[in-house]
């Protein structure tokens, strides 16, 4: 009886083993069939893709051949005038004194957009260029003005819906606690969509000494938007050149998304005098002949002192001169020796005593920030 049971167990064990072997063999064959089918399907997919590529290439050749060599899409001048690009570039020339390299770079970008539009009119291929930019330079060198004009150009050429400018800093983008940064960053992006987002002093978004800094979350959101929405949003990163270079070294993904780097040089004293004259003209004032050398000497000295900010410093000086002119005229008109009358010329002229002199500037020292 024992022998019978032993033989029966052995029989069942062998049978189970054989069944397992059979199942493994069948599974192996099935896996091989699946793998072979995948290889066949992949080969077929590649073959179909190659055929589609060939057909697309042939269609492109046929399309190009169908366009006469002497076909005209219009003149560059016509498009510059019709779309208002020429007017914007002329306004940029009038708004900004000097900055020849900056204006040349803006013209290059405008030229690319105009030529792309000419190509599109003929049915030629066009690809949306990377229009994200980096503006480097000291404060008051015209970065915000250029960003505003670029938005207008992009809108006129059909690359942005509205072309408006939104200026933001770290405080506008980065939150103070967990879960606060993403909504803030997305809200700013939402406001800028269809136009230009200028992030001033962008390097403050990244804190190398704190890997838990909330700025990293804002950067990741910006990177995604710059890639996915580049047809409807242009991001301009601005700041000092050395700090921006360091920022890009920490965030290589940001550097690869920025296709246009424009450096804004500091103004010379002569250019700052011209800027002051333009500001006065726009405000319907003018400097007297005696006032010009006073301001020129002032600005030369001011350039060597702390907190100098190029055109911003000039604007502060002009605003200060207007206040001093106002109190001068007020005192003259209310003095006992005056009939109280003030002429148009007096109301429009800034005299030398209205501007801060070099002597006053030196006496103030570091308090010159007050202008």
From Swiss-Prot:
Annotated transit peptide: 1-54
SUPFAM superfamilies in the record: P-loop containing nucleoside triphosphate hydrolases
Keyword tRNA-binding belongs to the record: no
SMART domains listed in its UniProt record: AAA (SM00382)
A matching Pfam family: AAA_lid_6
An MF annotation (GO) of this entry: ATP binding
Cellular compartments annotated: Plastid, Chloroplast
A GO CC annotation given for this chain: chloroplast
Key words of the record: ATP-binding, Chloroplast, Nucleotide-binding, Plastid, Transit peptide
Residues reported to bind ATP: 137-144
Stated family: Belongs to the CbxX/CfxQ family.
Reported function: Seems to be necessary for the expression of RuBisCO.
Protein name per the record: Protein cbbX homolog, chloroplastic
Native organism: Guillardia theta
């Amino acid at each position: 009886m024992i022998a019978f049971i032993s033989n029966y167990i052995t029989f069942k064990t062998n049978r189970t083993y054989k069944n397992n072997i059979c199942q493994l063999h069948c599974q192996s064959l099935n896996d091989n069939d699946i793998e072979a089918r995948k290889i066949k399907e992949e080969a077929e997919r590649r073959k179909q893709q190659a055929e589609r590529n060939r057909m697309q290439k042939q269609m492109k050749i046929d399309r190009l051949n169908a366009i006469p060599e002497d076909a005209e899409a219009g003149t560059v001048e016509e498009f510059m005038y019709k779309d208002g690009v020429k007017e914007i570039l002329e306004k940029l020339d009038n708004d900004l004194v000097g900055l020849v390299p900056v204006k040349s770079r803006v013209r290059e970008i405008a030229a690319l957009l105009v030529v792309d539009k000419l190509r599109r009119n003929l049915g030629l291929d066009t690809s949306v260029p990377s229009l994200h930019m980096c503006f480097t330079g000291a404060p008051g060198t015209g970065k915000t003005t250029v960003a505003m004009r670029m938005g207008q150009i992009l809108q006129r050429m059909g690359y942005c819906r509205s072309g408006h400018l939104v200026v933001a800093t770290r405080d506008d983008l980065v939150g103070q606690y967990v879960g606060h940064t993403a909504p803030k960053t997305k809200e700013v992006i939402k406001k800028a969509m269809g136009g230009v987002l200028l992030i001033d002093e962008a390097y403050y978004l990244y804190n190398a000494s704190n890997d838990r800094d909330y700025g990293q979350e804002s950067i990741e959101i910006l990177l995604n938007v710059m890639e996915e929405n580049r047809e409807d949003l242009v991001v301009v990163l601005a700041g000092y050149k050395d700090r921006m270079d360091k920022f890009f070294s920490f965030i290589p993904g940001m550097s690869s998304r920025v296709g246009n780097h424009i450096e804004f040089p500091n103004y010379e004293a002569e250019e700052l005098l011209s800027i002051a004259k333009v500001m006065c003209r726009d405000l319907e004032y003018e400097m007297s002949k005696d006032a010009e050398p006073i301001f020129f000497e002032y600005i030369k000295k001011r350039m060597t002192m702390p907190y100098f900010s190029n055109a911003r410093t000039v604007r502060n000086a002009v605003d200060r001169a207007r206040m001093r002119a106002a109190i001068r005229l007020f005192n003259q008109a209310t003095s006992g020796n005056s009939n109280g009358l003030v002429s148009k010329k007096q109301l429009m002229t800034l005299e030398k005593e209205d501007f801060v002199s070099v002597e006053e500037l030196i006496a103030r020292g570091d308090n010159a920030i007050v202008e």
